[in-house]
Amino acid sequence: MDNNETSVDSKSINNFETKTIHGSKSMDSGIYLDSSYKMDYPEMGLCIIINNKNFHKSTGMSARNGTDVDAANLRETFMALKYEVRNKNDLTREEIMELMDSVSKEDHSKRSSFVCVILSHGDEGVIFGTNGPVDLKKLTSFFRGDYCRSLTGKPKLFIIQACRGTELDCGIETDSGTDDDMACQKIPVEADFLYAYSTAPGYYSWRNSRDGSWFIQSLCAMLKLYAHKLEFMHILTRVNRKVATEFESFSLDATFHAKKQIPCIVSMLTKELYFYH
């Protein structure tokens, strides 16, 4: 398949009490909390890129043509941001889980953050290893604050290029133009995660066989332009706009022709994130 069509990344407590911490300052006071993540550790951190292109015949899933363009683009982009980039190709579901477990057990104490990019087929709540599905929640749980202590309080970014269902977006016409004194603070184990999904829940995610996926193209372009100027959520907003306004599917199948896409950002970050300091 090299006819420059766009493709999709899918598979063919009852009682409780509240506790008040007396004498504590309001989170809005700014007295105890810095407004942005500390990004001046000796290393920016790891960037793991899982690039699944070829799938076992038994899965019935097609090759993801164009994904190597995404992987190369991501590698260049995050290396420019001083991340240690590790590319992994065509991993089974077992290999993905083993990789995440292994990486989470590394010493990240000298690293400012962690990034994991997954390029694969997907469905809602799962991404696919080359031999079958992986529950995304299980995959990311290795990096929770109670499991990966050396990343506690640091930003953990998961970037997912995969379908989240089989709905199609036809579009609509528009007429409108951590410091030492914080060492004892307790934080939720799910804090400081950000999930950047290529598409909204339930929808297809589009990929071009020549240029790569719309989302990864846009993410890399916006990071190259703004990583040294803007906060990360502001960058992602620009990614959303670029995907939403500059791309439309082309397919010989009328069902899949002239469709749109909007990325979806789920943030549990507790501070602003800048890739510079």
UniProtKB/Swiss-Prot annotation:
Chain positions with S-nitrosocysteine modification: 163
Tissues/organs with expression: Expressed in heart, brain, liver, and muscle but not in kidney or testis.
Keyword line: Acetylation, Apoptosis, Cytoplasm, Hydrolase, Phosphoprotein, Protease, S-nitrosylation, Thiol protease, Ubl conjugation, Zymogen
Superkingdom field: Eukaryota
Residues with the Phosphoserine modification: 26
CDD domains per UniProt: CASc (cd00032)
GO biological process, one term: negative regulation of B cell proliferation
Modification(s) after translation: Cleavage by granzyme B, caspase-6, caspase-8 and caspase-10 generates the two active subunits. Additional processing of the propeptides is likely due to the autocatalytic activity of the activated protease. Active heterodimers between the small subunit of caspase-7 protease and the large subunit of caspase-3 also occur and vice versa.
Record-listed N-acetylmethionine modification sites: 1
Signal peptide (from-to): none
Keyword flag Ligase: no
UniProt cross-references to Pfam families, sorted A to Z: Peptidase_C14 (PF00656)
MF GO annotations: aspartic-type endopeptidase activity; cyclin-dependent protein serine/threonine kinase inhibitor activity; cysteine-type endopeptidase activity; cysteine-type peptidase activity; death receptor binding; endopeptidase activity; enzyme activator activity; peptidase activity
Presence of keyword Ion transport: no
Any one GO CC term of the record: death-inducing signaling complex
EC number per UniProt: 3.4.22.56
Residue list for modification N6-acetyllysine: 11
Reaction(s) this enzyme catalyzes, per UniProt: Strict requirement for an Asp residue at positions P1 and P4. It has a preferred cleavage sequence of Asp-Xaa-Xaa-Asp-|- with a hydrophobic amino-acid residue at P2 and a hydrophilic amino-acid residue at P3, although Val or Ala are also accepted at this position
EC class (word): hydrolase
Active site: 121, 163
Regulation of protein activity: Inhibited by BIRC6; following inhibition of BIRC6-caspase binding by DIABLO/SMAC, BIRC6 is subjected to caspase cleavage, leading to an increase in active caspases.
Function: Involved in the activation cascade of caspases responsible for apoptosis execution. At the onset of apoptosis, it proteolytically cleaves poly(ADP-ribose) polymerase PARP1 at a '216-Asp-|-Gly-217' bond. Cleaves and activates sterol regulatory element binding proteins (SREBPs) between the basic helix-loop-helix leucine zipper domain and the membrane attachment domain. Cleaves and activates caspase-6, -7 and -9 (CASP6, CASP7 and CASP9, respectively). Cleaves and inactivates interleukin-18 (IL18). Triggers cell adhesion in sympathetic neurons through RET cleavage.
Family: Belongs to the peptidase C14A family.
Subunit and interaction comment: Heterotetramer that consists of two anti-parallel arranged heterodimers, each one formed by a 17 kDa (p17) and a 12 kDa (p12) subunit. Interacts with BIRC6/bruce.
Name of the protein described by the UniProt record: Caspase-3
Organism: Rattus norvegicus
Gene: Casp3
